[in-house]
């Protein structure tokens, strides 16, 4: 919407092309997750391919009315959610994409969390193409421990990880390998390689929130 476009103009520089919006649904998107940019950026990139996001029930509790209107799919963490699988199949059957963040939580240090093989099993079960989207720089924009947003470039890499022709032949292990490979990131290395300067008064403000005595 208008707010999203304004945010990605003034708060962060999102670098992307039309690759994702040109892929014909239904398909499943898996992406790394460091913050709001990964969600808002995904909406911007999908354009008219209106997708449904899989989120945890704990997030539903924060803004239940708003989130339900957005058409999200709620997931109970650390369990096999049969109802969720039915809902995902329903959305795909309507010719819409489904977006999953397989790390299940925000990155704490600007590198990936563990991606479990269960997501690869789900992709195999759904029998639709798999698209990976990697965000580089969204952790730098706002680390998990910081309340301050920093203006910086966020680059996106979109890949069709598994095609419609491959999905029936490829193994779960190979699907998992491709997901992990395509979503591997290191935001501080990205900052170093691209000579990104982040100039704010208190660069470490909020870091004490994750320190323990």
For the regions a language model picked out, list residue spans one by one.
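Soluble catalytic domains of membrane acyltransferases
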Residues: 5-170, 174
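Unusually extended, aromatic-enriched hydrophobic runs near protein termini
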Residues: 131, 180, 207-210
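Glycine-rich, charged/polar anion/phosphate-binding loops
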Residues: 141-143, 197-200
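Short, structured interface segments
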Residues: 173-194
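Short, flexible, mixed-charge glycine/proline-rich loop motifs
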Residues: 198-212
């Amino acid at each position: 919407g208008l707010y999203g476009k304004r945010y990605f103009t003034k708060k962060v520089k999102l670098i992307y092309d039309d690759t994702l919006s040109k892929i014909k649904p239904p398909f499943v998107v898996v992406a790394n997750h460091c913050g709001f940019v990964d969600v808002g950026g995904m909406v911007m990139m999908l354009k008219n391919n209106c997708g449904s996001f899989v989120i945890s029930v704990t997030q539903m509790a924060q803004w239940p009315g708003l989130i339900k209107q957005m058409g999200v799919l709620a997931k109970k963490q650390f369990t096999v959610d049969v109802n969720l699988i039915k809902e995902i199949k329903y959305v795909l059957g309507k010719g819409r994409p489904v977006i999953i963040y397989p790390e299940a939580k925000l990155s704490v240090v600007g590198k990936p969390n563990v991606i479990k093989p269960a997501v690869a099993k789900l992709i195999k079960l759904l029998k639709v193409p798999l698209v990976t989207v990697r965000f580089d720089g969204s952790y730098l924009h706002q680390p998990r421990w910081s309340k301050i947003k920093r203006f910086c470039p966020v680059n996106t890499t979109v890949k069709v990880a598994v095609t419609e022709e491959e999905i029936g032949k490829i193994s779960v292990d190979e699907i998992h390998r491709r997901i992990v490979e395509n979503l591997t990131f290191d935001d501080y290395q990205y900052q170093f390689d691209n000579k990104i300067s982040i100039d704010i008064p208190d660069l470490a403000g909020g870091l004490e929130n994750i320190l323990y005595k």
